[in-house]
């Protein structure tokens, strides 16, 4: 009897970092609790991309929360997908929303939200927030736990 993971191509394999987000493959596994309302959180505290104009590096902490339906995002494929932005030029808003939309397309969750907490460039931090809609009633939704940027406090 299979586990529903036979199709995975990255987990358990030596896998090179994709050249770009477009080339990255997000894989999913079956949700073992499809009738249960629960939250999955991924935190990427060292996300990087490039400014599309200057080529300078941009850094963010991403917090991704989703309520799965039939599938879960396989975490190694997510790690590789996020890493593929390292040499990708895009503005903060584009990176954050593109990540969320790719996740929605990959696993069709009941609900998803993303917080992109970008570190200052030119003295201005940019925080980007997006969600698919209102959170399902009864979903335990903890605060994302990222304090607003305070500079020297």
Curated annotation (Swiss-Prot):
HAMAP family: QueF_type1. It is an enzyme of class 1 (oxidoreductase). GO terms for biological process: queuosine biosynthetic process; tRNA modification. Keywords: Cytoplasm, NADP, Oxidoreductase, Queuosine biosynthesis. InterPro entries: GTP-CH-I_C/QueF (IPR043133), NADPH_dep_7-cyano-7-deazaG_red (IPR050084), QueF (IPR029500), QueF_type1 (IPR016856). Its EC number is 1.7.1.13. One of its GO terms (cellular component) is cytoplasm. Belongs to the GTP cyclohydrolase I family. QueF type 1 subfamily. The active site is at 51 (thioimide intermediate), 58 (proton donor). It comes from the Bacteria. GO terms for molecular function: preQ1 synthase activity. It holds the Pfam family QueF. It comes from Paramagnetospirillum magneticum (strain ATCC 700264 / AMB-1) (Magnetospirillum magneticum). This is NADPH-dependent 7-cyano-7-deazaguanine reductase. PANTHER family: NADPH-DEPENDENT 7-CYANO-7-DEAZAGUANINE REDUCTASE (PTHR34354:SF1). It catalyses: 7-aminomethyl-7-carbaguanine + 2 NADP(+) = 7-cyano-7-deazaguanine + 2 NADPH + 3 H(+). The gene is queF. Catalyzes the NADPH-dependent reduction of 7-cyano-7-deazaguanine (preQ0) to 7-aminomethyl-7-deazaguanine (preQ1). The keyword Cytoplasm applies. It is found in: Cytoplasm.
């Amino acid at each position: 009897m299979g586990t529903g993971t036979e199709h995975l191509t990255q987990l358990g394999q030596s896998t090179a970092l994709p050249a770009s987000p477009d080339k990255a493959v997000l894989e999913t596994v079956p949700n073992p609790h499809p009738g249960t309302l629960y939250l999955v959180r991924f935190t990427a505290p060292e996300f990087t991309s490039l400014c599309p104009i200057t080529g300078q590096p941009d850094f963010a902490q991403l917090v991704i929360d989703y309520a799965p339906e039939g599938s879960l995002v396989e975490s190694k494929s997510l790690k590789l997908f996020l890493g593929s932005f390292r040499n990708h030029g895009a503005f903060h808003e584009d990176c954050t929303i593109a990540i969320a939309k790719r996740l929605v397309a990959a696993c069709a969750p009941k609900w998803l939200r993303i917080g992109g907490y970008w570190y200052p460039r030119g003295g201005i931090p940019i925080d980007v927030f997006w969600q698919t809609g209102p959170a399902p009633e009864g979903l335990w939704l903890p605060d994302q736990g990222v304090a607003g940027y305070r500079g020297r406090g």
